[in-house]
Each structure stands twice: as structure tokens, then as C-alpha cells.
Amino acid sequence: PTQLYLSEKKLQDIQMLYQSAETIQVDPISILAFGDCLLITDGHHRAYQALLAGRDTISAEWDRDGGDELYHLYAQACEERKIYSVLDLKNHILPQDEYEAKWYNWCDGFNQAVTLLLKRKADEIGPTNR
């Protein structure tokens, strides 16, 4: 995973979809290759709910939006917190307002720190070595 929390509300909305139809049509999740693993970049809630519903497959598509380096860092942050699978987010399900506050604040801070580090790294390389 590349996400630290799940929203209780989003999970409930997806669960309603699973309960309301025999043939469930949910958007595919987005993934990136990272070493020998696949990282979810979008669709953590859908993947979590699919696993809870007993599904062993889910539709996925390659994430072509860029930001691969950043997602790899997000995945490392998850691993540091012992989040190796979307099922590991079971104890990280929050009410919607708390989810938004914690997750979006964390992302903003993390992204700013990474941007500064990458800029510093580029400055150290200097224009002659680029």
C-alpha cells in the first residue's frame, strides 16, 4: 500500500455497492511496479472491501500519472509502520473527518519534505554533473 489510513465512510459506500448488486462494477484500482511487488496508488478502499467480500481478484490498471518516486517513498513509510497489505489497514480505519485531517495533513507534510530533499539533492549534483 501507499496509504496509511482508510475512511470508514468510503468503506461503507463501497460495501453498499457490493450488497446492492449481483454483478459489481467498481472502477479498477491503479498500480505501479516496485521491485517484485505491485503498489496500489489509487483504490485502497476498493481493494480492502473486495478482500473482505472474499474476492481473490480485482480489476487493475497501470498508473501512468507519474510520481513513481514519490509512491515508492509512500510505500516505504507504510512498511516502516508495518503496513504491508491493505488488510494491515484494518486498525487504521477512521471517521471521515479524522481521515481527511490526518491523511491529507500527513501527505502535505511528507510531499513538502520530499520536495525539499529532492531539490537539495539536485543542488548537490550541481549543473555540471546533471
Task: Describe the function of each predicted region.
Residues G35-R130:
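Basic- and aromatic-enriched surface patches that contact anionic nucleotides/nucleic acids
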